[in-house]
């Protein structure tokens, strides 16, 4: 099972992290729920761990702090983080650094994280081209982040 940290606890009471993370409080909620989810042991990896950057605007000190918390915990739990390439075309077309966010991934490298490259299936064209996948592998290698290419399964 893949952990997509989209909402704090429930979508019925809390806003979507990808479009509504505009305050330090929302960043803290994101980090708290990401860490709690990883600690359950139910998930193979954390999808788009930098999702909050779709709406936060700029990578400030608070982003760096929560990113370090998330990455440190993922590393200690041996949980891969997904380097999600689905938004790269959008980022480039609009001149933004959203997901994947370079500053987040520098922290992930510093914390000794492992990555898996992911491609959301929202647009079939992303799946049909290896362009973004190959680029992601090169970028992660340049950061010194090990990349896995299979989803780890639970061993009971």
Predicted regions located by residue number:
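Extended substrate/RNA-proximal surfaces in nucleic-acid metabolism proteins
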Residues: 1-77
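Charged catalytic cores and adjacent phosphate/nucleic-acid-binding surfaces used
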Residues: 58-156
